Structure formats: C-alpha cells, structure tokens
Amino acid sequence: MSFTSLPLTEINHKLPARNIIESQWITLQLTLFAQEQQAKRVSHAIVSSAYRKAEKIIRDAYRYQREQKVEQQQELACLRKNTLEKMEVEWLEQHVKHLQDDENQFRSLVDHAAHHIKNSIEQVLLAWFDQQSVDSVMCHRLARQATAMAEEGALYLRIHPEKEALMRETFGKRFTLIIEPGFSPDQAELSSTRYAVEFSLSRHFNALLKWLRNGEDKRGSDEY
C-alpha cells in the first residue's frame, strides 16, 4: 500500500512528555476523537431540525401577521367611508373598539407563537440531552481537562461511587480516585494541588434551560 493513500487522523491533545508513546494512549485519543465526531454529527442534525421547525413557525406567524394587516387595512378603509357618510359617532367608537380587540388578539397570537417556538427549542434540547451518554461525555471532558492540567503533577478525581469502575477501566492509575457519595452520577471534580475544576452535565444543561426560560419571561414583561 502506498503511504500517500493512508488515512490520517489529527489528534489535538498535547503529546505525553515521554520518548515512547504508549499504544493505549493513542487508542484512547482515537476513541475520544471518534466519539467527539459522532456527537458533533448528532447535535448538528438535532439543531438543524430545530432550526427548520422554528423557521416554519416564524414564517407562519409572519404570514398570519400580513393577512391580519390586510384585513385591518380593509376594515379601516370601510370605517372611514362609513364615518364620512353617516357620521355616526357611536358606530365609530364600536368599530374602533373592534379593531383594538383584533389588535389584542393578534398580539396574543404573536406571543403564543413566540412561546411555542421556545417550547419547541426546549423539547429539542431535552431530546438531545436524553440521547447523550453521560459516561462518554464525562470521560471525554476528563481526558481533555487532564491534558490541560498535565503540568500540575498529581491529579485527584472526585466521583460518585457508581463511576468508580468506569474511571478505573478508562484511566487506570492516571488519577487518584476519591469517592464522594454526595455527588450526582454525572458530577465530577478534577483537582491538583493548585486548583480544581468541577463539572456536571445535568447542572450545566439546567442552567441553559433556566436562561432560555428567563429570557422568555423578561420579553413577556416588555411593552409590545
């Protein structure tokens, strides 16, 4: 086989400070790279689907807005004509009130559409989150963080008891494991003598949902 046709995989992690690179390290990096590529493809497909659904909802809302605007313009023209012909103040007030009711209804429909878009995005995010492998995501983040902290010396990993076997199988003696029964299964803390990094997939995801919902609440309190 010609060496010019061999497939190449670029590993972005820092190489170990050793003359000989162990095959286990290369295998781990290739596995993490494949998992990262698969996760990117899945998340890209989910986000693209969410964008398409959101764009359709927005187009429908804009179309309804245009139709309502045309109807309101037609009603307003009729109102002006009848006002000039009949000069009936009472009828004019009633018709104006009707237009105001239509405007309030339209405003309500737009608010409902915006709320529906938010809910759709939230449902897509929840579906994406449910499809994620907590173990693979945690191992990937730990490996990446360990590479960044490679110069820190001894590294200590605090984890939930359920993850002890997984971490020993994945990282061997790379970390000093400390079992924390109070941690959630998706929570971990990697530390050295100088600093520590803690992460929790569910906590970060819930923070994203909170930001999404708070953004909707703030817009709902603004004047239209």
UniProtKB/Swiss-Prot annotation:
A single BP term in Gene Ontology: protein secretion by the type III secretion system
UniProtKB keywords: Cytoplasm, Protein transport, Transport, Virulence
Keyword Phosphoprotein set for record: no
GO cellular component assignments: cytoplasm; host cell cytoplasm; host cell membrane
Tagged with keyword Disulfide bond: no
Subcellular location: Cytoplasm
Disulfide bonds: none
Organism domain of life: Bacteria
Function text: Component of the type III secretion system (T3SS), also called injectisome, which is used to inject bacterial effector proteins into eukaryotic host cells. Acts as a regulator of the SsaN/SctN2 ATPase activity.
Quaternary structure and partners: The core secretion machinery of the T3SS is composed of approximately 20 different proteins, including cytoplasmic components, a base, an export apparatus and a needle. This subunit is part of the cytosolic complex. Interacts directly with SsaN/SctN2 (T3SS-2 ATPase).
Cross-referenced NCBIfam families: HrpE_YscL_not (TIGR02499), PRK15354.1 (NF011881)
Family named by the database record: Belongs to the SctL stator family.
Protein name listed in UniProt: SPI-2 type 3 secretion system stator protein
